[in-house]
């Protein structure tokens, strides 16, 4: 089976925060799992280097947009790598390859009659002497009356036109823009109304889209899909490939999602492999992002794919809700965030991954708390998982000189592990990652209870053969926990694999155990709870 996984493209205008990772982490879990199953996986993403936010940041810092994009693209690559993300292709939207692919898609839509020209009114700043891109216009949402940008309201998820905003102002200088006429290209989105409606109905029947994606898209369909501009007067981006319009750029909402397509083509060129199997309608596709990106993946991207004649549209939409920080809405402008480069300097990446999975905003907003983060590490990763691994392997090191005791796999334990693989695999495929991880840790707690009830420290003297059986089965459990947890906690799983000399990485029970165990090291270190206050002081002290 071919599996295509697309992770949303973060804007290269500032560091990643935990909200980004909470929404993107499911993609890596899926990729690792399906590779272990032996499926043909293509997992792609990249940095959005063309968006208006990059131009704004560059202007604020007095540097070029390219310098800003380069800085954060490199930082993103480093952060994703250090967190264990296994993208097959992580690229950027200002690459020549991406520009060519997007322009080809634009021309194909134009040829098929899905794009047309239209004279429209647009916000114009007399002070800045320029037409304002949608993100350059700020004001009040006409629907929920919260602060909003000209393209979308984050509060109610409404897709907006800048002219819809109340109390409009230029983001650059704060003045009230005038309204002037200009010509733009439009995408005939309304022509895909029935196909999008059918896609939502199928997703509802199969449960392959998150509830928030279904509800929001149903709302858009009920209101009637409106044609959207596909060109804008932007300072950076992909030029319109039509003579006389080269000074205009392809609007980022259609250009950025086409990044999945361009990344796929780039991967094919780089590897010499064929990517057609990921776009022929037979592939299982997953699109992973936050709920603010729902309309771009449930409406815009399917319409683009249908418009260019591709056989597949998003089958699974994994759209997480928001992550708050210490019960407050995350705000990059106010510096109320936990920044990824910062937290990676001091904490194990598996600790970060674990917390963001068991507290994932899968169906509702969830909160990142420094207290809960540190206590979950100490009680679950160290106290439950690390404790079971460490006391089992240390027992072998101390009483058997590192030689693996002889034994046979307990039939009941074998059955339990086989059922666990099936249950966890099904949960992952259904994008219920929290359920999957919690199921494994239920088994870890069972393993600790098994160790305590068998009392190998007493069996060693009273019944040495039973003691060997106990420890043998504990190692069997450890080997399989490492395999089951690899999609979630890859770094600690790798440490266990190295200790146990496990080569097989397939998604199946591990029955081959090592003959010898050397150099046993703690799987996790305890985090001093005093760090809670230190982190809170740092967080509150950095607020703008």
Swiss-Prot record:
Instruction: Provide the GO biological process annotations.
Output: methionyl-tRNA aminoacylation
EC numbers listed for it are 6.1.1.10
Chemical reaction(s) catalysed: tRNA(Met) + L-methionine + ATP = L-methionyl-tRNA(Met) + AMP + diphosphate
S-adenosyl-L-methionine among keywords = no
Q: Which InterPro entries match?
A: aa-tRNA-synth_I_CS, Anticodon_Met, Met-tRNA_ligase_1, Met-tRNA_synth, Methionyl/Leucyl_tRNA_Synth, MetRS_core, MetRS_Zn, Rossmann-like_a/b/a_fold
Provide the primary localization: cytoplasm
Residues engaged in binding Zn(2+):
141, 144, 153, 156
- The short sequence motif called 'HIGH' region sits at 10-20
Q: Does the keyword Aminoacyl-tRNA synthetase apply?
A: yes
Q: Which family does it belong to?
A: Belongs to the class-I aminoacyl-tRNA synthetase family. MetG type 1 subfamily.
Q: Report what the protein is called.
A: Methionine--tRNA ligase 2
Organism of origin is: Bacillus anthracis
Instruction: Quote the record's cofactor note.
Output: Binds 1 zinc ion per subunit.
As for what it does, the entry says: Is required not only for elongation of protein synthesis but also for the initiation of all mRNA translation through initiator tRNA(fMet) aminoacylation.
């Amino acid at each position: 089976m071919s599996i295509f996984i697309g992770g949303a493209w973060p804007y290269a205008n500032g560091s990643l925060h935990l909200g980004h990772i909470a929404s993107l982490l499911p993609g890596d879990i899926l990729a690792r799992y399906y590779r272990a199953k032996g499926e043909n996986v293509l997992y792609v993403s990249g940095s959005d280097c063309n968006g208006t936010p990059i131009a704004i940041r560059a202007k604020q810092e007095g540097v070029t947009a390219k310098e800003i994009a380069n800085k954060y693209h490199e930082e993103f690559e480093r952060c994703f790598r250090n967190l264990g993300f296994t993208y097959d292709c992580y690229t950027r939207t200002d690459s020549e390859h991406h520009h060519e692919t997007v322009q080809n898609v634009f021309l194909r839509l134009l040829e098929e009659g899905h794009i047309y020209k239209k004279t429209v009114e647009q916000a114009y700043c007399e002070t800045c002497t320029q037409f304002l891109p949608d993100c350059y216009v700020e004001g009040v949402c006409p629907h929920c009356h919260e602060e909003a940008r000209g393209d979308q309201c984050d509060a109610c998820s409404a897709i907006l036109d800048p002219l819809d905003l109340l109390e409009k102002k230029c983001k650059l200088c704060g003045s009230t823009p005038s309204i002037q006429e200009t010509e733009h290209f439009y995408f005939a989105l309304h022509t895909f109304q029935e196909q999008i409606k059918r896609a939502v109905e199928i997703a509802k029947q199969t449960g392959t889209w998150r509830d928030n994606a279904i509800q929001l898209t149903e709302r858009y369909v009920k209101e009637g899909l409106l044609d959207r501009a596909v060109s804008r007067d932007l300072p950076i981006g992909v030029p319109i490939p039509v003579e006389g319009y080269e000074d205009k750029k392809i609007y980022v909402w259609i250009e950025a999602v086409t990044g999945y397509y361009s990344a796929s083509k780039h991967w094919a060129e780089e590897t010499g492999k064929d990517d057609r199997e990921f776009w022929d309608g037979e592939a299982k596709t997953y699109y992973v992002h936050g709920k603010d990106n729902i309309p771009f993946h449930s409406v815009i991207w399917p319409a683009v794919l249908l418009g260019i004649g591709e056989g597949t549209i998003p089958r699974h939409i994994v759209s997480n809700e928001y992550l708050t920080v210490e019960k407050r809405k995350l705000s990059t402008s106010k510096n109320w965030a936990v920044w990824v480069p910062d937290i990676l300097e001091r904490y194990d990446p598996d600790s970060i991954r674990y917390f963001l999975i068991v507290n994932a905003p899968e169906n509702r907003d969830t909160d990142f708390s420094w207290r809960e983060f540190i206590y979950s590490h100490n009680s679950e990763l160290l106290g439950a998982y690390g404790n079971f691994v460490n006391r089992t392997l240390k027992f072998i090191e101390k009483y058997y000189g590192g030689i693996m005791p002889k034994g046979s796999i307990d039939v009941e334990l074998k059955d339990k592990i086989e059922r666990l693989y099936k249950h966890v695999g099904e949960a992952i495929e259904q994008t219920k990652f929290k359920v999957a991880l919690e199921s494994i840790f239920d088994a870890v707690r069972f393993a600790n209870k098994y160790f305590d009830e068998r009392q190998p420290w007493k069996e060693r003297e009273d019944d040495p053969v039973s003691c060997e059986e106990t420890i043998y089965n504990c190692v069997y459990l450890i080997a399989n926990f490492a395999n089951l947890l690899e999609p979630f906690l890859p770094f600690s799983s790798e440490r266990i694999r190295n200790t146990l000399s496990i080569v097989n990485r397939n998604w199946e029970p591990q029955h081959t155990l090592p003959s010898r165990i050397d150099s046993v090291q703690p799987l996790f270190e305890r985090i001093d709870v005093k760090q809670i206050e230190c982190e809170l002081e740092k967080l509150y002290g950095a607020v703008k």
